[in-house]
Amino acid sequence: MTDQTTRLPVRRALISVSDKTGILEFARELSALGVEILSTGGTYKLLKDNGVAAVEVADYTGFPEMMDGRVKTLHPKIHGGILGRRALDGAVMDEHGIKPIDLVAVNLYPFEATVAKPDCDLADAIENIDIGGPTMVRSAAKNHKDVAIVVNTGDYAGIVESLKAGGLTYAQRFDLALKAFEHTAAYDGMIANYLGTIDLAADTLSTEGRGAFPRTFNSQFIKAQEMRYGENPHQSAAFYVEAKKGEASVSTAIQLQGKELSFNNVADTDAALECVKSFVKPACVIVKHANPCGVAVVPEDEGGIRKAYDLAYATDTESAFGGIIAFNRELDGETAKAIVERQFVEVIIAPKISAAAREVVAAKANVRLLECGEWSAERAAGWDFKRVNGGLLVQSRDIGMIKAEDLKIVTQRAPSEQEIHDLIFAWKVAKFVKSNAIVYAKNRQTVGVGAGQMSRVNSARIAAIKAEHAGLQVQGAVMASDAFFPFRDGIDNAAKAGITAVIQPGGSMRDAEVIAAADEAGIAMVFTGMRHFRH
């Protein structure tokens, strides 16, 4: 078994980086420790200009850089020095004048940043495919028994500390090698994804339609947490997050207190947070089993999130028990106190948690309190995935939103201004309810939610039952449906319940029949032209 604690010193290092963050300080520390530094191109110039002694690779190999820098380090004196097994290949290395290279610090051409530029063409992308860098990275990672490979700028300080203590252990070199292979895997994946979307006939990158999906799909996720179990206790589980952090989300959130997040906690918290992010004014969303069971929006001058929580909770006090609560404003002490005194809650998440709120929630040690940071009003584009047996469904994120001016009034009666506000509110909520989804809302508060039924009319019936059970007034409320009504019965039931306005996508072959039902009941109805199935 390999000794994991014995430290190996570094006598010679090769440094060639595109991201020069911290490289001067790192090189100075290496030089101060007596390490001979080999370097290339822009990195060599940076070191030389700043007084750090280094040998240019071209001088070391006796072979110049050529082909506009395409060939720099692809030489036996470099790769022999990296790949040479110290216990086996010493004689061969001596015979050919190859000196051992004990540490390689390399990061790669910025391919991702290059192809993200609007004016990037295929030729630009090709020139930013690194060849020498990944070759050195893989060589050093393969020979991690004798060589340390450094691809992350964040590792520099720790490496210097270890070298000052006598060298790097095998365990450290193994970990660095793993990071290196993760790095090159992600890099090659980006290249394959990009080239897989190229339309050769147009010699350009396709950005719409089928051409937006690469021939193979490569994406990298990093394990953030191993969980006690999965959706059910007999299932094992872990939580992986995207390598590149995006907008504020459950994946970027910091847990301030509470028990470890479970598989279901993460899924439900994501549903709650993404729903509350849909609203600009202060809002509260309560989720149970990935469905919103209570949502409310209240302007600051009318009570803000404190009042919004009361209204969201009132929608369905039974389902709120053991739920997830999300806010789109800083959680204050008063609101936190109302929550912990009123109900059992699994998770509370907000962009910011006040000191007063932290103090209040600390009395309930098991409550998971998450701070996710602020987000912009614009939802970021990206991909959603759904695993099926033997495959993966990939689609663009459902970030479609509608405004009042997008609504198509299809009935004789137009909705009032208040009804329009409530219709848009209910529509935003329905987007996050499992299909078939029906949402009853009034004064920007949900009064009944019907979720996950195979029949749309049954979802409408459940929404009415929920409202009655909660003691909430349906008369004068509006109704949102995530998809069109295939028959008029959904409207007939809504009319009996007291619904006065309806928002739905439209598009049924029986739209005329459905519109007629609304007109007969004096209901105002608008079409969005956008469906929000959620499975």
Curated annotation (Swiss-Prot):
Domain text: The IMP cyclohydrolase activity resides in the N-terminal region.
> Biological process (GO) annotations?
'de novo' IMP biosynthetic process
Write down what this protein is called: Bifunctional purine biosynthesis protein PurH
Q: Which UniProt keywords apply?
A: Hydrolase, Multifunctional enzyme, Purine biosynthesis, Transferase
| Pfam families reported in the protein's UniProt record | AICARFT_IMPCHas, MGS
Offer an example of a GO molecular function term for this protein.
phosphoribosylaminoimidazolecarboxamide formyltransferase activity
InterPro entries found in the cross-reference section:
AICAR_Tfase_dup_dom_sf (IPR024051), Cytidine_deaminase-like (IPR016193), MGS-like_dom (IPR011607), MGS-like_dom_sf (IPR036914), PurH-like (IPR002695)
| Known catalytic reactions | (6R)-10-formyltetrahydrofolate + 5-amino-1-(5-phospho-beta-D-ribosyl)imidazole-4-carboxamide = 5-formamido-1-(5-phospho-D-ribosyl)imidazole-4-carboxamide + (6S)-5,6,7,8-tetrahydrofolate; IMP + H2O = 5-formamido-1-(5-phospho-D-ribosyl)imidazole-4-carboxamide
Pathway in which this enzyme or protein is active: Purine metabolism; IMP biosynthesis via de novo pathway; 5-formamido-1-(5-phospho-D-ribosyl)imidazole-4-carboxamide from 5-amino-1-(5-phospho-D-ribosyl)imidazole-4-carboxamide (10-formyl THF route): step 1/1; Purine metabolism; IMP biosynthesis via de novo pathway; IMP from 5-formamido-1-(5-phospho-D-ribosyl)imidazole-4-carboxamide: step 1/1
Mention any one GO cellular component term assigned to this protein in its UniProt record.
Answer: cytosol
Say which family it is in: Belongs to the PurH family.
- The EC designation for this entry is 2.1.2.3, 3.5.4.10
The segment(s) forming the MGS-like domain are: 6-151
